[in-house]
Regions:
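Terminal alpha-helical segments
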Residues: 1-126
C-alpha cells in the first residue's frame, strides 16, 4: 500500500473512532459530530481507494462524486449509492444552526459508515 493511502486510512480511522465515541457518550453526546465524522470516515476511505488506484479526485465532500470515480475499479460499489447519498448530507448540513441530529439519526449514520468502511477496507486488503 502506498504511504499516502496509509495516511488516508489513518485519518479515516480517526474519524471512525470519533463517530463511535460520540454516539456512545453518556454525558453530553454530540450526535452532530457522530454524523459528521461518519461522513468524513467514508469520504477518506473512498479517497484512499482512489489514491491506491491512481485515480485523480478533486476537493469534494460529495460521496456520490467519489463513488462515480471508484466505479471504474469497483463496479459493485454502485450498490452503496444510497448509503453514500445519506451520509453526504452530514458533510456540511448539520454543522451549522438549523439542523440537529438525534441519537437515532447518529446511529443510522454510524451503521452506514460501518458498512461502507468494511467494504472498502476489504478492497484495500485491510
Amino acid at each position: 500500500m502506498k504511504p499516502i493511502t496509509r495516511e488516508w486510512v489513518k485519518k479515516a480511522e480517526g474519524d471512525f473512532a470519533t463517530a463511535q465515541r460520540e454516539i456512545r457518550a453518556r454525558k453530553n453526546p454530540n450526535y452532530d459530530a457522530s454524523c459528521f465524522h461518519s461522513q468524513q470516515c467514508v469520504e477518506k476511505y473512498l479517497k484512499a481507494r482512489l489514491q491506491e488506484a491512481n485515480i485523480t479526485f478533486g476537493k469534494t465532500h460529495d460521496l456520490s462524486t467519489l463513488l462515480d470515480l471508484a466505479l471504474e475499479i469497483e463496479p459493485t460499489w454502485d450498490a452503496l449509492r444510497e448509503d453514500l447519498r445519506a451520509l453526504t448530507v452530514f458533510a456540511v448540513g448539520y454543522r451549522y444552526p438549523g439542523d440537529a441530529a438525534d441519537k437515532e439519526l447518529a446511529r443510522e449514520a454510524v451503521t452506514r459508515c460501518r458498512k461502507v468502511r468494511r467494504i472498502i477496507r476489504h478492497s484495500l486488503s485491510l
